Amino acid sequence: MAPQKPETFMLSTEAQQALPHDAQVALQQVDNLKYFLISAPVDWQPDQYIRRFLLPTGEYVSCVLWNNLFHISGTDIVRCLSFRFQAFGRPVKNSKKFEEGIFSDLRNLKSGTDASLEEPKSAFLDFLYKNNCIRTQKKQKVFYWYSVPHDRLFLDALERDLKREKMGQEATTVAVSEPALSFQYDSSQSLYEQLTKTQQANSSSFSAQQPAFPPGQSSSPVMRNMDAMPRPI
């Protein structure tokens, strides 16, 4: 059973299969990005400090090794989310307001546990700036790679805009193509809660269909590897 994606979990299976080819290609590109977000810190060379991923928008997202920890900048997080909204069929039309919302959400990630708080023009910020990972060297948090809840950030930003539209206010993104045009918003609970429940229901259904294995034995080496992954995104 295919995992539920934040971009399409509100659509029926039939609707997902009926998506236009362009939409399916765009969502596959999102999957490619997600794979990078999971796997980027693996298999680095001894003298390697940065690994890049080229987004279809032409911008790069970078995984940066500094002080033996892998990091991602707030600027690159926004780049990831801007691309995901474009692939979803809801491109960003008010970049400043969109970015402000994301950085407001990122305040929930605390220095020391989820991020490194860098002083202005520190050696780390200088490296990030020279590699186009940040736009300014002012004091800021740089986030630990596996501490960033990318799906949650996407859904929270989407929910903000859907609520704005429902109240007749200007949203930061606009639905222009599928699957965004078919996305049905239920305001009785948060999108993240709805996605979590859908994933749990699918997981329970999937587990019920699987043969029993002895304790400690996984049915798949892929599942064993995923079990060992640091905090899921």
Language model features by range: what are they?
Residues 61-97:
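Short, amphipathic alpha-helical interface elements at domain boundaries
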Residues 12, 60, 64, 81, ...:
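Generic signal for short, ordered secondary-structure residues
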Residues 27, 34, 47-52, 58-61, ...:
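Beta-strand-rich binding-surface signature
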Residues 95-182:
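Chromatin/DNA-recognition segments of nuclear transcriptional regulators
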Residues 28, 35, 39, 79, ...:
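Charged/polar, solvent-exposed surface patches and flexible loops
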Residues 1-75, 169-233:
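Proline/serine/threonine-rich intrinsically disordered activation/regulatory regions
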Residues 23-27, 88, 107, 124:
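Homeobox/homeodomain signature
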